[in-house]
Amino acid sequence: MNKNFIESNLNKQELSFEVPLRPQCLTDFVGQDSIRDRLEVHIGAARQRGEVLGHCLFSGPPGLGKTTLASILSKAMESNLVLTSGPVIEKAGDLAGILTSLKTGDVLFIDEIHRLNRSVEEYLYQAMEDFALDLMIDSGPNARSIQVKLNQFTLAGATTRLGLLSEPLRSRFAFTCRLEYYDPMILQKILLRTSRILNVKIDSEAALEIAKRSRGTPRVANHLLRWVRDFAQIKANNYIDLSVANRALTMLSIDEKGLDEMDKKMLQTMIDHYSGGPVGINAIAASIGEEPSTVEEVYEPYLILQGLLKRTPRGREVTSLGYQHIVGSSQR
């Protein structure tokens, strides 16, 4: 069984099965109430004035709905959604090609916008403010600058690392928000909605148990539901109750706090090799065979939220709760 279930589902592109599960409007977007309310005002005001929607920046851990919100924006404004990501736009010409193809009102979604090349980012400033691009043609004594006018568009940026965005870029967004982890009761509602779409038979108690082990993340919750559905199909006559959910999740080695084998390996390694810390992120990553960015973006935020890990000026430390959880897990 895959011991990296969480990472495999948070560090990948959206699969085709997820598309019909995505909310189509703000009314269907459950949770993140304050963000939803603010977006209703932002969208409603732009529509009443007949203007293009102001640029939006969504930050927060992976899997919480940043891409979904960008899709909702485009539908609310009755425009097209164009998807790309920071690492894909390597040079100014790549950006120019995307921007010049946009129609008036289109929503350009740049995922991992913090990974944009700095030289490319500088071209984006003018595009966001003036809807124009100054491009250099030729080189040497024949070099000259031409200005390309752009159709007015909305940039929707998404980032898991807000601190890596430059201030000039951050300040050009009219709407900024941070998505937070979801409450289990909200995730239960999302799972029950998903079960109706996928025609999965599940009771509310089982849905809540899956929600509790989903790290506060809708994407993880939906993938867990798919796994439990498959388990129920083979082992439980296609019906998911609490017992079936527990058996299926135990097979994935996902515990009652939503930690998988890699989460526990990280804490165990810190305890065994570094006396619980403090220890630097690069040392942790090397010890468990992961990239530092994966540790920071996928594992660390949830462990901190659960009170199992803390950041200090000298590095990361396992908390007393973290010790208790690892000791308790090893005794079960």
From Swiss-Prot:
Span list, region Small ATPAse domain (RuvB-S): 183-253
Keywords linked to the UniProt accession: ATP-binding, Cytoplasm, DNA damage, DNA recombination, DNA repair, DNA-binding, Hydrolase, Nucleotide-binding
Listed GO biological process terms: DNA recombination; DNA repair
EC number, as in UniProt: 3.6.4.-
Domain of life of the native organism: Bacteria
Sequence positions that bind DNA: 311, 316
Location of the region described as Head domain (RuvB-H) in the Swiss-Prot/TrEMBL record: 256-332
Its biological purpose: The RuvA-RuvB-RuvC complex processes Holliday junction (HJ) DNA during genetic recombination and DNA repair, while the RuvA-RuvB complex plays an important role in the rescue of blocked DNA replication forks via replication fork reversal (RFR). RuvA specifically binds to HJ cruciform DNA, conferring on it an open structure. The RuvB hexamer acts as an ATP-dependent pump, pulling dsDNA into and through the RuvAB complex. RuvB forms 2 homohexamers on either side of HJ DNA bound by 1 or 2 RuvA tetramers; 4 subunits per hexamer contact DNA at a time.
Subunit relationships: Homohexamer. Forms an RuvA(8)-RuvB(12)-Holliday junction (HJ) complex. HJ DNA is sandwiched between 2 RuvA tetramers; dsDNA enters through RuvA and exits via RuvB. An RuvB hexamer assembles on each DNA strand where it exits the tetramer. Each RuvB hexamer is contacted by two RuvA subunits (via domain III) on 2 adjacent RuvB subunits; this complex drives branch migration. In the full resolvosome a probable DNA-RuvA(4)-RuvB(12)-RuvC(2) complex forms which resolves the HJ.
Domain notes: Has 3 domains, the large (RuvB-L) and small ATPase (RuvB-S) domains and the C-terminal head (RuvB-H) domain. The head domain binds DNA, while the ATPase domains jointly bind ATP, ADP or are empty depending on the state of the subunit in the translocation cycle. During a single DNA translocation step the structure of each domain remains the same, but their relative positions change.
Protein name: Holliday junction branch migration complex subunit RuvB
Gene it is expressed from: ruvB
